[in-house]
Amino acid sequence: MTSSDPAGRRPKIKAASVMRSAADQLAELLGRPPESVSALTRTEDGWEADVEVLEVERIPDTTSVLASYRVTLDEEGDLVEYRRTRRYTRGQIDRPN
């Protein structure tokens, strides 16, 4: 049981708050601002988010290098793990396998 909820249920965190939290915490660790959060999934233990980050800025912008990071957050929205899953140029289009 928690002191904030006498029934012992965990407080609900809104998806928008989790998205901001994932982006902010990853930016603090990497020293680079996120471009976007491209995916957010509720898990048994918390949340998983995919965050897109500009890694190398180039001109023209379509040649800039971005990376996709998978971020794992606990039930309170605190970052517990992150890993880079992909690097790509901004102009690259995803193609079906």
State the predicted function of each range.
Residues R42-W47, D74-D78:
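A short, structured loop/turn motif at beta-sheet edges
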Residues T62-R87:
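A short, surface-exposed beta-strand/turn
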Residues G8-L40:
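Short, non-transmembrane alpha-helical segments in secretory-pathway proteins
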Residues E28-L29, L54-V65, D94:
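Short, cysteine-centered beta-strand-loop-beta hairpins and adjacent loop/turn segments enriched
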Residues A23-L26, L30, V51, Y69-L73:
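Amphipathic alpha-helical interface segments used for dimerization/assembly
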